[in-house]
Curated annotation (Swiss-Prot):
It is found in: Cytoplasm. 3-phosphoshikimate binds at residues 30-31, 35, 176-178, 321, 348. This is 3-phosphoshikimate 1-carboxyvinyltransferase. Monomer. It holds the Pfam family EPSP_synthase. Phosphoenolpyruvate binds at residues 30, 101, 130, 178, 352, 422. GO terms for biological process: amino acid biosynthetic process; aromatic amino acid family biosynthetic process; chorismate biosynthetic process. Catalyzes the transfer of the enolpyruvyl moiety of phosphoenolpyruvate (PEP) to the 5-hydroxyl of shikimate-3-phosphate (S3P) to produce enolpyruvyl shikimate-3-phosphate and inorganic phosphate. HAMAP family: EPSP_synth. Belongs to the EPSP synthase family.
C-alpha cells in the first residue's frame, strides 16, 4: 500500500508480526529538502537538488515556491530549480503550507520581505490550532505588519512589509526552533544586517544547524555566539546558485530503526546519514538497549533485533523527531523509560505527549507525563490490541503506533494512515516488503462503530 493511491485507505490494519528481513531505501529528509527547495527558489539562476523528499512537506514547499515565481523540473533523482529575485515580487501571494509547520514558519520569514501575503490551511484542527505567536511577535519588532487569529496568532495570517526592516529582533524558541530558522531566511534575503537574540533556549539546535548549513552552502554566512543564542546575518551576502544533496529523514529513519529493533529482524537500510539524528544519540540509544547495528560501506547500516529490550532514559532534545518512535519501542522494554526535555514536541502536528498517551492507553500501554516528559512503563509480554487508534494527523504518531500494533495479539486499526505521507509516503509499502503484516482498508462506518 502506498499513499499515492487515488483512493486513500480510511484505516491501516496492523497485525502481529514475528520477523522482518530485507532491505529498505530510506526516504530523504523533509527538513533538508524544504530548506534546499526554498534556498534554491530564492536564488536567481539555476540550482540543483539531488534526492529531494517526496512527502507532503516537500511538495507543499515546492508548490508555494512556485507561487513566488520559481520553477521546478526533474532529471532522474535531481530536481532543477530556476529561482526568483524576491526584490521583484510586488504582488499579493497566498501561501498554503498544508499541515507543515516548518513550511509555514520558513515562508513567514520570507514573507517579512514581501509586500502582501496571506497564509491559509485546510488543516484547521492541526496546523490551524498551533500557535505562531512567537514568530508574529518577532516579525512585528522588525516593522512587519501581521494580522492573526487570537492571542496565539493562529492561521489565517496576513502580512505586509515595506521592506524597511529593523536591524534587531528577539524570539522565543522554547516551543520550536523553526521560528528562528524562518528569521534567518528573512535576514538572508534582506538588504540590511539582522541580529536575532533567542530569549530562552533552542529546543532543537540540530535543526537550526541544518538551516545554517543550508544557507552557507548557498553563500550566506550566519554568525552566532558560543552560547548559540545570538545570531547575525549580514545583509551584503546573496544567494548563489548551488548543488544540494539531501540525506535521510530523521523521523522516518528513527521509525524504521525502532521498528526493526523491536522485533526479530535482519534488515539493511540504504541511504543512512546521521546529521539529523542527534549526532549518534539515536543509534547509541538503540544499541545500548539491545539492538545490534553495524555500519556498512556506501551509507548503509545493518540492523538486527530480537533480543530483550532494556529500559533506558533518553534526552529528547538531542533528536526530537525520534521520540515517538523510540517511545513506541520502549513499550516492550523490561522496566520504565523516561523521555525528557521534550516539552516542544507538544507543539508539533499533534501534542506528541498527551495525544500519544491517549492512544497508548487504548492499547494497554502504561504511561505517565509531565510538562516536558513522557514516561513509558514497558511490558515485554506484549499487549492485547484489538483497538482503533487515532494518528492525530501526525506521521510520527502513526509510525510509532504501527510498531506497537505489530506486537499485539489482535489487529490494531489506525485511522487516516495517509498522513504518514507528511514525511514518508511509502512507509507501509516499505515495511510490508520486509515482512510487516499491514493492510490498507476502507471501512466508512468503522470509526463510528468502534472508536
Amino acid at each position: 500500500m502506498t499513499t499515492s493511491d487515488r483512493l486513500q485507505p480510511s484505516f491501516v490494519e496492523v497485525k502481529n508480526t514475528s520477523t522482518l528481513s530485507g532491505t529498505i531505501d530510506l526516504p530523504a529528509s523533509k527538513s533538508s529538502s524544504t530548506r534546499a527547495l526554498l534556498t534554491a527558489a530564492l536564488t536567481p539562476g539555476i540550482s540543483t537538488i539531488r534526492n529531494v523528499a517526496t512527502g507532503f512537506n516537500s511538495n507543499a514547499m515546492k508548490h508555494n515556491c512556485e507561487r513566488l515565481g520559481a520553477s521546478f523540473s526533474s532529471e532522474g533523482d535531481t530536481t532543477v530549480v530556476k529561482g526568483v529575485d524576491v526584490m521583484h515580487v510586488d504582488r499579493e501571494i497566498v501561501f498554503d503550507p498544508g499541515n507543515s509547520g516548518v513550511v509555514l514558519r520558513l515562508l513567514m520569514g520570507v514573507a517579512g520581505y514581501l509586500p502582501d501575503t496571506r497564509f491559509v490551511t485546510q488543516y484547521r484542527y492541526s496546523l490551524g490550532v498551533r500557535s505562531q505567536a512567537e514568530m508574529v511577535a518577532a516579525l512585528r519588532r522588525l516593522n512587519v505588519e501581521c494580522e492573526a487569529v487570537g492571542p496565539e496568532a493562529r492561521l489565517p495570517i496576513s502580512m505586509r512589509s515595506t521592506r524597511a526592516l529593523g536591524k534587531h529582533t528577539e524570539v522565543s524558541c522554547k516551543k520550536s526552533s523553526q521560528f528562528l530558522s524562518g528569521l534567518l531566511y528573512l535576514g538572508a534575503i534582506g538588504e540590511r544586517d539582522l541580529e536575532i537574540d533567542v530569549v530562552d533556549h533552542i529546543t532543537a539546535p540540530s535543526m537550526v544547524h541544518t538551516t545554517i548549513n543550508n544557507l552557507a552552502h548557498a553563500g550566506v554566512a550566519v554568525e552566532y555566539d558560543a552560547a548559540f543564542r545570538r545570531f547575525f546575518v549580514p545583509g551584503r551576502d546573496r544567494f548563489k546558485p548551488s548543488e544540494f544533496t539531501v540525506g535521510a529523514d530523521p523521523a522516518s529513519t528513527a521509525a524504521i530503526l525502532a521498528l526493526c529493533g523491536s522485533l526479530a529482524s535482519d534488515v539493511t537500510l540504504n541511504g543512512f546519514f546521521e546529521e539529523e539524528l542527534g549526532s549518534g544519540a539515536v543509534i547509541r540509544y538503540l544499541t545500548d538497549t539491545g539492538t545490534l547495528i553495524d555500519e556498512l560501506p556506501g551509507n548503509r547500516i545493518r540492523i538486527r533485533g530480537g533480543a530483550s529490550i532494556r529500559a533506558q532514559d533518553f534526552d529528547g532534545s538531542l533528536a526530537p523527531d525520534a521520540v515517538p518512535a523510540l517511545a513506541g519501542r520502549a513499550a516492550f522494554a523490561e522496566g520504565t523509560s523516561t523521555f525528557y526535555n521534550i516539552e516542544h514536541i507538544r507543539y508539533k502536528e499533534s501534542d506528541r505527549i498527551s495525544d500519544f498517551r491517549r492512544e497508548l492507553d487504548k492499547l494497554g500501554v502504561r504511561s505517565e507525563e509531565k510538562l516536558d516528559q513522557l514516561i513509558i512503563h514497558g511490558n515485554p509480554r506484549s499487549y492485547r490490541g484489538g483497538a482503533v487508534v487515532d494518528g492525530h494527523y501526525d506521521h510520527g504518531l502513526i509510525m510509532a503506533l504501527t510498531t506497537i500494533g505489530l506486537h499485539c495479539e489482535h489487529p490494531v486499526l489506525i485511522k487516516e494512515p495517509h498522513h504518514v505521507g507528511q514525511t514518508y509516503p511509502d512507509y507501509f509499502a516499505d515495511i510490508g516488503s520486509i515482512g510487516a503484516n499491514v493492510d490498507g482498508l476502507i471501512y466508512p462506518n468503522v470509526a463510528a462503530a468502534r472508536a
